[in-house]
């Protein structure tokens, strides 16, 4: 999370929010290639790398998935989300209760047929800025693990 210093930047003053959001730590991801070649199935292509990063992060920092209010991915879509949850379970990590996906927040999979994800850069930036940062600043959420797939 990017920090927000209200005294210097005025960030959040317009709506009365004063809580600072800070980066607590990072884990760098790695490429995990399961050989998915279908450009319309980006969720399945990105889920293995997301799983590897989440599991590595939790191990590196000595944390359980429940430490985070939300574990947020970019745009795996509903297909990729199911794969991610299954892969994490296989590695002994249950994220089923606190995983959310920015693409699933931004789009309506039922009416827009967006099941496999793909627009992770746009979804990550937009939903982090417009949805998660305000919830962190207000204190509604305390900690998120942000994995911008």
Predicted regions mapped to residue ranges:
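Short basic/hydrophobic patches in alpha-helices and adjacent helix-turn junctions
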Residues: 131-138
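Short glycine-rich phosphate-binding loop at a beta-alpha junction
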Residues: 67-74
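Glycine- and other small-residue-rich loops at beta-strand/loop junctions that grip anionic moieties
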Residues: 39, 73, 117, 121
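Short loop/turn motifs at secondary-structure junctions
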Residues: 64-67, 140
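Short His-Asn-centered micro-motif
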Residues: 74-75, 147
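Condensing-enzyme catalytic core mediating Claisen C-C bond formation in acyl metabolism
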Residues: 2-55, 60, 97-104, 113, ...
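Short glycine/threonine-rich loop-to-helix capping motif typified by GTGT followed
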Residues: 76-91
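Conserved catalytic cysteine-centered active-site region
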Residues: 1, 17, 90-130
């Amino acid at each position: 999370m990017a920090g927000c210093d209200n005294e210097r930047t005025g960030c959040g003053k317009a709506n009365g929010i004063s809580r600072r959001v800070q980066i607590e730590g990072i884990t760098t991801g790695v490429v995990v290639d399961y050989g998915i070649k279908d450009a319309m199935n980006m969720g399945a292509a990105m889920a293995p790398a997301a799983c590897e990063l989440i599991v590595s992060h939790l191990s590196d920092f000595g944390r359980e998935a429940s430490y985070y209010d939300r574990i947020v991915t970019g745009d795996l879509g509903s297909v990729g989300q199911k794969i991610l949850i299954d892969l994490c379970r296989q590695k002994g990590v249950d994220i089923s209760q606190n995983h959310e996906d920015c693409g699933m927040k931004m789009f309506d999979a039922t009416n827009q047929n967006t099941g496999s994800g793909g627009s992770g850069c746009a979804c990550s930036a937009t939903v982090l800025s417009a949805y998660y940062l305000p919830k962190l600043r207000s204190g509604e959420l305390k900690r998120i693990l942000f994995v911008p797939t």
